[in-house]
Amino acid sequence: MDAGQPRPEDRHLPVMRDRVVDLLAPAVQAALEAGRTPVAVDGTLGMGGHTEALLTRFPHLRVIGIDRDAHAQAMAAERLGPLADRVIPFHGTYDRVPEAMAAAGVTKVDAALYDLGVSSYQLDDRERGFAYSYDAPLDMRMDDTAERSAATLVAELDEQELRRIIRRDGEERFAGPIARAIVRARAEAPIETTGRLVEVIRSAVPVAAGATGGHPAKRTFQALRIAVNEELDILDAAVPAILDALHVGGRLVVMSYHSLEDRITKRHLSAWATSTAPPGFPVVLEEHEPVVRVLTRGTEKPTEEEISENRRASSAKVRAVEKIRTSRTTA
């Protein structure tokens, strides 16, 4: 890396790092006490901050590091240095955890972390087109080998589908006017940059809304990013996949940054933590008993001190569970 370039560890502050490690630590320790080499899954390796903390604390731990962003994986390897010898990288999305585990030669894991959403590195890399704060190509692909970019969606989707995505994935109340404005604007010239898209969105959102609801493009950019990367569909498949993959005693931590992510996470964790026995049954059979127990009361959030040091941590919410028996065959 050039001398003028910041190191990966200087550019990325892992959110709630110590709390994440503390939540996963008992599962790693239990594996050691059982006489096996503990294995964790970092389903969203990013720049490796959480994995670095886990590997540093547990010298015998191995981590399967999953990420669809090859650039981030390379920077994680640089950051981890000699610790990288205990990381088994997997290029792909984290719903493919069974494939990643098979490639690593393991059938069960002891701990797992999903740190959701877009990373600081991706937001700060202007050429990736994730941010509305500066002009850049309208891309938003977490995996730059994927075919479909945000510019593709903006160019090809009809008004009804654009409105649906912006409303569903961005929770944007002005989804209709924004979708209409996009269709009108692209008829005049292609919308290929973030700056042009911001202008189009501004033209559709009442000025008064921007005074109280933050940047007028925030929710539309979120919606397009989620749609381009199929983030919610992947999360929906990934939570049950990793719960099934955990050893009994294994733990999962999920860190979300907006209500859509947290809603999906909560739905799955609550279902796995709830008995499936019909109400009023005098005896609850084992197959109906909860598979996990919830470790967090609702969600846990960063401290004010951490938020003051890393403003991007402000919206983080953590949920965690421990697997207490083998998975239901229908889970």
Swiss-Prot record:
EC number from the UniProt entry: 2.1.1.199
Membrane-spanning residues: none
GO molecular function (one): rRNA (cytosine-N4-)-methyltransferase activity
UniProt-listed InterPro entries: RsmH, SAM-dep_MeTrfase_MraW_recog, SAM-dependent_MTases_sf
Subcellular location field: Cytoplasm
Binding, S-adenosyl-L-methionine: 48-50, 67, 115, 122
Spans annotated as Disordered: 297-331
GO biological process, one term: rRNA base methylation
GO CC terms in record: cytoplasm
Keywords linked to the UniProt accession: Cytoplasm, Methyltransferase, rRNA processing, S-adenosyl-L-methionine, Transferase
Extent of Basic and acidic residues compositional bias: 298-312
Reactions listed under catalytic activity: cytidine(1402) in 16S rRNA + S-adenosyl-L-methionine = N(4)-methylcytidine(1402) in 16S rRNA + S-adenosyl-L-homocysteine + H(+)
Entry similarity comment: Belongs to the methyltransferase superfamily. RsmH family.
NCBIfam families in the record: 16S rRNA (cytosine(1402)-N(4))-methyltransferase RsmH (TIGR00006)
General function of this protein: Specifically methylates the N4 position of cytidine in position 1402 (C1402) of 16S rRNA.
Name of the protein in its database record: Ribosomal RNA small subunit methyltransferase H
Species per Swiss-Prot/TrEMBL record: Micrococcus luteus (strain ATCC 4698 / DSM 20030 / JCM 1464 / CCM 169 / CCUG 5858 / IAM 1056 / NBRC 3333 / NCIMB 9278 / NCTC 2665 / VKM Ac-2230)
